[in-house]
């Protein structure tokens, strides 16, 4: 149900329900069903939904966006204090800031540091589906992050915590303190899972790119599947 699934209006033999769960300042499971379109200045010919924001309890904002043919943002996203990360889930997109330009395809990503606005446009005949992340940058000493672009298909998986059934690939330098956050892909073989329930200060956003499974949030198990979004808050407020 909802615009993402092209299933709107009156539905026969259907009772209003949702798998989505919202626990402000704790966690959220947001499914594609029920997402509504938002109108945001600068986004032209785009269907956009806000997944998380400071109103939910996050220090960042995540958007899921369908960029239609000739869709674009030429006003620029971000400002002198905001960093931007864009990930292409489907389709292709031209993405650039003031010092780098990249033609991205599915799996492509672009990190734009604070002080550089990010721009994009869809020059293809097909829709592009993207995840967009925006956050206020917290500088450390005189360290300065650089623009980074790439594609996850060119990054090899590594064993996650020495397990042979869970794998990870980092999209940003994990040990460079110029970068105050990271994006990574986790891949689980069938039946695999984390070795323990994580309890830590870091907050997370997570987008399920494929498959389905179970996720434990505040000691409650939830079924999750492709295109679901999860927000996990910091354990201290």
Question: What positions do the PLM features span?
Answer:
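Double-stranded beta-helix
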Residues: 2-8, 123-166
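Ligand-binding loop in jelly-roll beta-barrel domains
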Residues: 46, 56-58, 100-101, 114-140, ...
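Short acidic-glycine-tyrosine-enriched beta hairpin
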Residues: 85, 98-115, 218-235
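Long compositionally biased, domain-poor regions of proteins
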Residues: 94-96, 102, 120-122, 189, ...
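An N-terminus-focused feature that recognizes amino-terminal "leader" regions
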Residues: 2-61
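A short glycine-rich, His/Asp/Glu-containing loop-to-beta-strand
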Residues: 37-76, 158-197, 202-203
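Glycine- and acidic-residue-biased ligand/ion/polar-headgroup-sensing regions
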Residues: 69, 80-98, 201-219
């Amino acid at each position: 149900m909802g615009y993402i699934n092209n299933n709107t209006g009156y539905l026969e033999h259907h009772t209003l329900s949702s798998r989505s769960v919202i626990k402000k300042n704790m966690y959220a499971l947001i499914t594609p069903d029920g997402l509504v379109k938002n109108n945001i200045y600068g986004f032209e010919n785009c269907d956009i939904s806000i997944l998380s924001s400071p109103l939910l309890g996050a220090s960042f904002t995540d958007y899921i966006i369908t960029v239609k043919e000739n869709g674009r943002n030429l006003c620029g996203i971000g400002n002198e204090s905001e960093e931007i990360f864009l990930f292409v889930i489907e389709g292709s997109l031209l993405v650039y800031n003031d010092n780098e330009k990249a033609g991205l395809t599915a799996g492509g990503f672009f990190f734009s540091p604070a002080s550089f606005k990010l721009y994009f446009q869809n020059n293809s005949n097909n829709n592009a589906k993207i995840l967009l992340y925006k956050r206020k940058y917290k500088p450390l000493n005189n360290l300065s992050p650089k623009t980074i672009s790439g594609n996850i298909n060119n990054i090899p998986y590594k064993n996650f915590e020495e397990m042979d059934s869970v794998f990870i690939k980092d999209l940003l330098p994990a040990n460079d303190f110029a970068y105050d956050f990271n994006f990574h892909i986790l891949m689980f073989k069938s039946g695999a899972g984390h070795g323990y329930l994580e309890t830590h200060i870091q907050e997370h956003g997570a987008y399920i790119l494929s498959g389905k499974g179970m996720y434990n949030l505040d000691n409650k198990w939830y079924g999750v599947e492709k295109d679901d979004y999860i927000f996990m808050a910091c354990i201290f407020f």
